[in-house]
């Protein structure tokens, strides 16, 4: 990150961060690594919205090659790995470690925007995701969400500036 910032300063440009609201809420970033930039363009955009936007553009794009690339991105598991794996498979899949982002984004919205207690969020999640996740899985990832959200606050206390796109954000400003 420091090398990228130095390079940006030499060019008179800025280092734009790609971390999204979901990653910031869970603290799923390396402190002063990918967590730091000069402007966090996706800081208030949840990962599930990013996926929907990419899907929409892939479905409406007239460029077949770009559509193919976008669909490949959507089919690739979320991972912090930066280099191609040696055996051709991604070893570290983020959602295997922290849980499904669609659940975390749901929890985040109802905690921050609606101000609901964990018990109510759990009940709503059980109804909303019935048939997709069992109650034990929903509860497991809800506990993980709350633990990570509060344990990782220190990373959000020093975030770079970024836009507020929707009604939910975790910026300390």
Where are these regions (language model features)?
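ATP/NTP-dependent adenylation/nucleotidyl-transfer catalytic domains that generate, transfer
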Residues: 1-173
